[in-house]
Design a protein with these regions (language model features):
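Alpha-helical repeat scaffolds in large eukaryotic proteins
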Residues: 14, 18, 46, 50, ...
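Extended aliphatic helical segments
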Residues: 17, 42-45, 60, 70, ...
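Amphipathic alpha-helical interaction modules
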Residues: 22-69
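Short terminal alpha-helical segments
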Residues: 1-42, 94, 101
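Amphipathic alpha-helical binding modules
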Residues: 70-104
Length: 104
């Protein structure tokens, strides 16, 4: 697993949801909304980056505009790549992105 695989998963995800408007993000999904599911993934990626850097985990703000979630995802994935985590973390991140893309 490489950062290229994670980048590919991110680009596929963004191609699917990057154009969504607020009503699509608000649609219900098990345990909340589609936006809630993406925010949970953003938080997981941010936590994985913090762990890889040996830094404390910090809360990821839940912004009032769900359209910002894709940008938040881009930022935390870039942070994860910069942290140089192990292959297992990269694989899990790519897998979670792909799974959420299929769920949405």
């Amino acid at each position: 697993m490489s950062t290229a695989t994670l980048d590919q998963a991110l680009e596929r995800f963004i191609r699917q949801v990057g154009h969504w408007e607020a009503p699509r993000w608000a649609a219900p999904l098990a345990g909340g909304s589609r936006a809630d599911a993406l925010h949970a993934l953003v938080t997981w990626v941010a936590d994985a980056a913090a762990d890889a850097e040996g830094e404390p985990r910090r809360p990821v703000p839940r912004l009032t505009n769900d359209l910002a979630l894709v940008d938040q995802l881009r930022v935390v994935v870039a942070d994860l790549r910069a942290a140089n985590p192990g292959e297992a973390v990269l694989a899990e991140a790519a897998g979670r992105l792909t799974a959420l893309r299929h769920t949405l």
